[in-house]
């Protein structure tokens, strides 16, 4: 099946190729999950009971549970947006140290967010288990959606941590390694040689002997003539 030329151009577009990267896909999923979590609990997470007009959290009437989920979802959503924007300009970064620092920060935050969402899932599921759904007419579906997406956010952030670790490992640990190797090549080229025409060996009775471009450990010195005593005849 032959695709139109416009679709080929769309597939080769830089923006489309950027969005098809595994890291970009994981960030988009993490951001969408976080958006649904905090928006659903922020709108339908606080309801009033049938016998009271006071608003309460649908998760066992625990205000801390709803506040924790809303705050974590909002901060996680902002984190995904910020890192997605930095990824778009990652190729324009020329500083190697800045790239390594950014990838290290990405890895640390991904591990932290994976732990946060695991704790959030356990906490929200425990509060939902102890809550009575008959007390609230609305908000049950929002609570279930927040619990489910909290669970699915854990593998998403683990994937982001793995991808960040891969990028961090691919970077050269010593940025000046290549310059050191080039410097050693230059030094080896400029080292004196015993067969170099610019340093020919010196021959003569009072000359010093050179072996392999290094001075001999023992230097020979001419001995002074000795006076011999002749017997009287």
Swiss-Prot record:
Compartmental location: Membrane
Keyword hit for Transmembrane: yes
Residue segments, region Disordered: 191-233
Lineage per the UniProt record: Eukaryota, Metazoa, Chordata, Craniata, Vertebrata
Protein name: Synaptogyrin-4
Family note: Belongs to the synaptogyrin family.
Tree of life domain: Eukaryota
InterPro entries (alphabetical): Marvel, Synaptogyrin
Record's keyword annotation contains Transmembrane: yes
Membrane topology: Multi-pass membrane protein
Occurrences of domain MARVEL (ranges): 18-169
TM region positions: 25-45, 66-86, 104-124, 145-165
GO cellular component terms, A-Z: membrane
Ranges of biased composition (kind: Polar residues): 204-219
Pfam families, per database record: MARVEL (PF01284)
Keywords, alphabetical: Membrane, Transmembrane, Transmembrane helix
Disulfide linkage: none
């Amino acid at each position: 099946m032959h695709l139109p030329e416009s679709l080929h151009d769309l597939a080769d577009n830089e923006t489309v190729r950027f969005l098809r990267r595994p890291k970009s896909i994981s960030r988009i999923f993490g951001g969408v999950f976080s958006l649904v979590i905090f928006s659903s609990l922020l709108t339908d997470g606080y309801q009033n009971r049938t016998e009271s007009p006071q608003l309460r959290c649908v998760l066992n009437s625990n205000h801390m549970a709803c506040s924790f989920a809303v705050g974590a979802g909002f901060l996680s959503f902002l984190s995904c947006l910020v890192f997605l924007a930095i990824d778009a300009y990652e190729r324009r970064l020329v500083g190697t140290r800045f790239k390594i620092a950014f990838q290290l920060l990405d890895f640390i935050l991904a591990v932290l967010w994976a732990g946060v969402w695991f704790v959030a899932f356990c906490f929200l599921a425990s509060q939902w288990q102890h809550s009575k759904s008959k007390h609230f007419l609305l908000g049950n579906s929002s609570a279930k959606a927040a619990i489910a997406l909290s669970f699915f956010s854990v593998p998403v952030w683990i994937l982001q941590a793995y991808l960040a670790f891969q990028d961090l490992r691919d970077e050269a640990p010593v940025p000046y390694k290549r310059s050191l190797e080039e410097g050693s090549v230059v030094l080896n080229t400029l080292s004196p040689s015993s067969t170099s025409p610019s340093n020919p060996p010196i021959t003569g009775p009072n000359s010093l002997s050179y072996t392999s471009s290094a001075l001999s450990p023992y230097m020979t010195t001419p001995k002074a003539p000795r006076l011999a005593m002749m017997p009287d005849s």
